[in-house]
């Protein structure tokens, strides 16, 4: 991000929001692929409408909120856009959903993890958000907007060969792989590398082994300890054939040599593949602004 956008500053400074899991068997995300996709499309349209703003036509923003928002999300949007609406300078902010994956879907309620890109006057920035939406009278309305979210995963379905069980096994595997890949300690660089190497396979494993000395030295020189934040979030973008692509978000907790801790939002895509009873990463693609 070259320069912080007014709205993005508000988005990334919002409080992390927690949520609740749904009962086992209640999560139809990717199980009912057609309705999951339709719900994600509806949430995408609603999010892009209410998170864009043109100071030359403020009434359009109010109309978008009235049509697409309910419950707590109304107050959340008021807070997020308070400074933007008071700006003495013209604002033309366009928000697009870059990626989105369903965390849970129950037919009349959907929660998704989305990467937003905001553009204004040639500058751009990213934010990762968890949206909750409710179907009301045949229309999906946003009911909660959690920026830099840390929310518990839905209760997992048994790994019994069903689509839901495969999905949740892949997500658990992706979270475990992410914990090993993105957790490092400069006082134990060799151990940090070994933990990462143990959770990768295929081309990624070849790359790690070829660059082992470089990785170990980079960890040692960093002078930091990095850990995942609480309740890291993972949602499947695709699933099939013992493979999955997972959208993963956490706020990394980075501790420097003086003991100071800084939170760094981090979003990435992980390709994972089933390897016996475990899942291993075959590719990692950090999500950055276009």
Can you annotate each of these PLM segments?
Residues 31-86, 162-221:
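Core segments of small alpha/beta cavity-forming domains
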Residues 40, 50, 69, 102, ...:
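A compositionally biased, intrinsically disordered/low-complexity signal enriched
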Residues 70-78, 82, 96-105, 110-111, ...:
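Intrinsically disordered, glycine/charged-rich N-terminal periplasmic/extracytoplasmic linker segments
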Residues 86-123, 220-258:
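Surface-exposed, charged secondary-structure patches
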Residues 124-158, 245, 265-290:
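Short beta-strand edge/turn micro-motifs at domain boundaries
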Residues 81, 116-118, 146-149, 212, ...:
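A mature extracytoplasmic/lumenal domain signature
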Residues 16-22, 196, 206-214, 220, ...:
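A broadly structural signal marking compact, well-ordered functional cores
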Residues 2-45, 111, 127, 146-183, ...:
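Juxtamembrane and targeting peptides
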